[in-house]
Amino acid sequence: STPPKTLFPYTTLFRSKKNVQNPQTTAAGSENTAETTAVLKQQIKVAALKGPTAIGMVQLMENAKEQTAKNDYEFQIAATADEFSADLIKGNVALAALPCNAAATLYNKSNGKIRILGINTLGVLSILDTGDSVQTVADLKGKTIYTTGKGTTPEYTLRYLLSSAGLNPDSDVTIEFKSEAAEVAAVMANAGTEEVIAMLPQPYAATVLMQQPDTRIALDVTEEWEKLNGSDSTVVTGVLVVNTEFYKNNRQAVDDFLKEYKSSVQYVNSNVDGAAQLVEDFDIFKAAVAKKAIPKCNITLITGQEMQDKVEKYLKVLCDANPNAVGGQMPDDGFYVK
């Protein structure tokens, strides 16, 4: 059974009105019609996942609720991308934030019905350590690393990171997979005096740090990846995509959305406390966790050629590990809005 969607139907609740001044009738009876200013806002449905990929837009969500956004946005926060992918391909959802490899898969499977506008979240993975022996990726040699996501992007990311540091992921380390982040957290909680190393995404890493003060973030996977592979290569977790048909017919609305999204990202990164409260208000996750997680979520907005370069390099890593991770093949040039 799929979890219920959290839907914020601002379109219906907060419909923007035309600002029309009433014509004033003078004593002489002649009508003096004041200048009429009509502001018609476009209704646009936006979807995102309950997690780091939605964090960057919380201020925009708040503005939409307060009717101060440029358009009439309706936001859907879903547990998985499957909840809105069909609507995105059909155009019922115009814009969405979702995992990078899910976007590539949708593009390939729908024959180009969606396009990518920008990167909105870089890496959200951290390597946690209950001791202090891990300072670099090379220090993981001979260790056991607990993590989740066997056969998915976290595994491919970890293996590539280890390989980049000259370690063999199959013989130099032991990767112990658990089915859920909560199980990994439990292993760390029950560590006692034994050192436990784990790789977890936000907000789970933040939750572990709150529950276990002795645990530390030993490595930020994104930072280490860039150190080993150069800054033009990075971990790309979340991207913003647009329905191709909607983009063709509504360039101005898409440009406006990107401008508002960029402001929202700047707000989130510079006002962590305020943003954390909004994350809780919109039922993405709790404010206390968000406060710890936001600085480690690498929330951003990267567009144009830089976006394409980073996305292509990251998807190539996934595609080399398993072509199915990106929908069977690397997406062609038409995937990118430049």
Which residues are covered by each model-predicted region?
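Short, solvent-exposed loop/beta-turn-alpha elements that line the ligand-binding surface or hinge
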Residues: A64-N71, E223-S233, I299-Q308
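Secondary-structure end/capping motifs
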Residues: Y247-A321
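A bilobed periplasmic-binding-protein/Venus flytrap-type ligand-binding module shared by bacterial periplasmic
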Residues: Q59-M61, L125-V134, T234-A253, T300
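Conserved C-terminal helix/tail region of periplasmic/extracytoplasmic solute-binding proteins
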Residues: E312-K338
